[in-house]
């Protein structure tokens, strides 16, 4: 049995297709979702969405939002999302290096928070390209 997964951002539909299973990064940790999962609504953290489709795992970088699961329907509404296959590895690595440098030179509470958030986003994009099995 399959699940219908929709991943939406304010500007576009990133994914709208049937899947076999997903692993979703939530604010309280990762959760695996199979068909007939109990209905839940949860906050989505900055992290990787793993999608199992035809016995292959695909990855997507999610930038926070929320998800609703029920009746074999999963709707994920996020600030931004990118399929791992759509991310330019060189650009993502450069962004990560810049973010790491910005964390080191950040001054003041607000700058440190913003720099750390940018670093989390950059790390997530790199991880989506090179998923750990």
Swiss-Prot record:
The UniProt entry, under SUPFAM superfamilies, shows: Epsilon subunit of F1F0-ATP synthase N-terminal domain
Q: Which InterPro entries match?
A: ATP_synth_F1_dsu/esu (IPR001469), ATP_synth_F1_dsu/esu_N (IPR020546), ATP_synth_F1_esu_C (IPR020547), ATPsynth_dsu/esu_N (IPR036771)
Tell me if Thylakoid is a UniProt keyword of this record.
yes
Q: Please report the record's description of how this protein sits within the membrane.
A: Peripheral membrane protein
Name of this chain's protein: ATP synthase epsilon chain, chloroplastic
UniProt similarity note? Belongs to the ATPase epsilon chain family.
Q: Does the keyword tRNA processing apply?
A: no
Give the highest taxon in the source lineage.
Eukaryota
Principal location listed in the UniProt entry: plastid
A GO CC annotation recorded here is: chloroplast thylakoid membrane
Task: Print the organism lineage.
Answer: Eukaryota, Viridiplantae, Streptophyta, Embryophyta, Tracheophyta
PANTHER family per UniProt: ATP SYNTHASE DELTA/EPSILON CHAIN, ATP SYNTHASE EPSILON CHAIN, CHLOROPLASTIC
The record's subcellular locations are: Plastid, Chloroplast thylakoid membrane
Which Gene3D superfamilies does this entry report, sorted A to Z? 6.10.140.480, F0F1 ATP synthase delta/epsilon subunit, N-terminal (2.60.15.10)
Q: Outline the subunit composition.
A: F-type ATPases have 2 components, CF(1) - the catalytic core - and CF(0) - the membrane proton channel. CF(1) has five subunits: alpha(3), beta(3), gamma(1), delta(1), epsilon(1). CF(0) has three main subunits: a, b and c.
GO terms assigned for molecular function: ATP binding; proton-transporting ATP synthase activity, rotational mechanism
Which keywords label this protein? Answer: ATP synthesis, CF(1), Chloroplast, Hydrogen ion transport, Ion transport, Membrane, Plastid, Thylakoid, Transport
Main function: Produces ATP from ADP in the presence of a proton gradient across the membrane.
């Amino acid at each position: 049995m399959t699940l219908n997964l929709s991943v939406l951002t304010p500007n576009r539909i990133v994914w709208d297709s049937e899947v076999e299973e997903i692993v979703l990064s939530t604010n309280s940790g990762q959760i695996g979702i199979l068909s007939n999962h109990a209905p839940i609504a949860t906050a989505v953290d900055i992290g990787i969405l793993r999608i199992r489709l035809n016995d292959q795992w695909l990855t997507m970088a999610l930038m926070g939002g929320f998800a609703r699961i029920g009746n074999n329907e999963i709707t994920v509404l996020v600030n931004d999302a990118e399929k791992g296959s759509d991310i330019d590895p060189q650009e993502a690595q450069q962004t990560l290096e810049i973010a790491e440098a910005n964390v080191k030179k950040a001054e003041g509470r607000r700058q440190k928070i913003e720099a750390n958030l940018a670093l989390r986003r950059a790390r997530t994009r790199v991880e989506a390209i090179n998923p750990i099995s």
